[in-house]
């Protein structure tokens, strides 16, 4: 791949004019050596390990940002799923552990901490169930703790008992947190990855090292401007522009990850090259799709345009780093993307269309606000639909949905900061209650038999 002098200038402009940033440096921390049958001892061990390993993360990010002139927006921590770490306590609530995570994260100054999680794709242990039932109060009583539940996989199928409980958990969290904000910190996955640096779904997988650095980059504005300034006419040429731009974005993330690894003396794990939008004008995935030729994101052709974008980003990123991992693609969070917000408000971008888009993009239904009266079984049905797409297509899918108590279609909810605001989107009138209440497990598909 040849590099022209104009491309070097473009790289400089990425930061100055196009909202390019390193979205996060995330340290993953293994907590297995913190296990104790005494929950107070466990909490003490967790606090000590997180504050010891993560104490220099924020300062390191500041030094690297100043050295290279690249904004590093967030510093985060992910930990081993707490349902695994807390099982020996036999406690009936893990809220105190969530509060310990919150205190530890605040003590070292990070933005978020993830890993208040349970992996229940094939069944729930007593500890898994305790954790899931602890989520509403944990979200109510903490500020920066994020939670996730993996309810399915291509190899295991979909655990519908866990899907039902997840829907009830989200509904309960919405009822006890202001405007359902606690739900913005809960993700329900199918095929969750163990090295995700992004919140709210990050956790530190059991196959990872004792500590690891994972980096997430962001550059929707860079891609959009590259397309606007290119001479691309055919979609083949559009894909080539996106691929070359993703290469440049990825090289920056690789540099930051390697440097952070040296400074912190922690191994570099992966670089997640997902295009992660923000509510800022010019930092939108939806606007990239419109630049390709759509009048509005959500119209016919949107899924195809998103597939092109997602694939080109991966191809460009793979050439720039041998450590690509995480989710790596394009995020479509409604409340965090100015173009998605506008498309949803116009009525063109619907929940159904977003579901179709998730079949070809990085994750799933993300930061979607729905009426507060939405029943738990409907939320479970939405989760099951999304999980089915992930299970059949052997990809990660997820749901981060916010039922906003007291609000209905036509209103909106303001989350602030990177989480933005979202119009309340309609859900289907029909009921899936009988289907969800059947429970059991949707068997793994035939494509799970790969050996």
Swiss-Prot record:
Coiled coil: none
UniProt organism field: Actinobacillus pleuropneumoniae serotype 5b (strain L20)
HAMAP family, sorted: UPF0210
Family to which the UniProt record says this protein belongs: Belongs to the UPF0210 family.
Entry protein name: UPF0210 protein APL_1491
Name of a matching Pfam family: DUF711
Classification via InterPro entries: UPF0210
Domain of life: Bacteria
Subunit architecture: Homodimer.
């Amino acid at each position: 791949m040849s590099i022209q002098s104009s491309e070097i200038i473009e790289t400089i402009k990425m930061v100055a004019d196009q909202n390019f940033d390193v979205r996060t440096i995330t340290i993953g921390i293994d907590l297995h050596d913190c296990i104790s049958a005494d929950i107070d001892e466990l909490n003490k061990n967790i606090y000590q390990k997180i504050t010891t390993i993560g104490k220099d993360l924020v300062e390191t990010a500041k030094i690297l940002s100043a050295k290279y002139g690249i904004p590093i927006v967030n510093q985060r921590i992910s930990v081993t799923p707490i349902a695994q770490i807390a099982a020996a306590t036999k406690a009936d609530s893990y809220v105190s552990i969530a509060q310990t995570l919150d205190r530890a994260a605040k003590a070292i100054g990070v933005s978020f901490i993830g890993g208040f999680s349970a992996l229940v794709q094939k069944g729930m242990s007593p500890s898994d169930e305790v954790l899931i039932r602890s989520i509403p109060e944990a979200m109510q009583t903490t500020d920066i703790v994020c939670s996730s539940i993996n309810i399915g996989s291509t190899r295991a199928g979909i655990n519908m008992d866990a899907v039902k409980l997840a829907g009830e958990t989200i509904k309960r969290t919405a009822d006890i947190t202001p405007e359902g904000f606690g739900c913005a910190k809960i993700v329900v996955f199918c095929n969750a990855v163990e090295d995700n640096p992004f919140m709210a779904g990050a956790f530190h997988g059991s196959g990872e090292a004792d500590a690891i650095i994972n980096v997430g980059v962001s550059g929707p504005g860079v891609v959009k401007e590259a397309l606007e300034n290119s001479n691309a006419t055919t979609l083949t040429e559009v894909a080539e522009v996106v691929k070359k731009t993703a290469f440049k974005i990825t090289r920056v993330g690789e540099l930051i990850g390697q440097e952070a690894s040296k400074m912190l003396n922690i191994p570099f794990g992966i670089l997640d090259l997902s295009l992660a939008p923000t509510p800022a004008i010019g930092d939108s995935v939806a606007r990239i799709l419109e630049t390709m030729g759509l009048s509005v994101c959500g119209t016919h052709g949107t899924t195809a345009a998103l597939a092109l974008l997602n694939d080109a980003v991966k191809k460009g990123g793979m050439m720039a780093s041998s450590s690509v991992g995480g989710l790596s693609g394009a995020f479509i969070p409604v409340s965090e993307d100015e173009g998605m917000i506008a498309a949803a408000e116009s009525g063109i971008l619907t929940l159904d269309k977003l579901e179709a888009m998730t079949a070809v993009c990085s994750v799933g239904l993300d930061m979607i606000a729905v009426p507060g009266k939405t029943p738990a079984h409907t939320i479970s049905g939405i989760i099951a639909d999304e999980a089915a797409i992930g299970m059949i297509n052997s990809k990660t899918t997820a749901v981060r949905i916010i039922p906003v108590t007291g609000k209905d279609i036509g209103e909106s909810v303001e989350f602030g900061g990177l989480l933005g605001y979202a119009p309340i989107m309609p859900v289907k009138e029909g009921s899936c209650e009988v289907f969800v209440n059947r429970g059991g497990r949707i068997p793994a598909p035939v494509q799970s038999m790969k050996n």
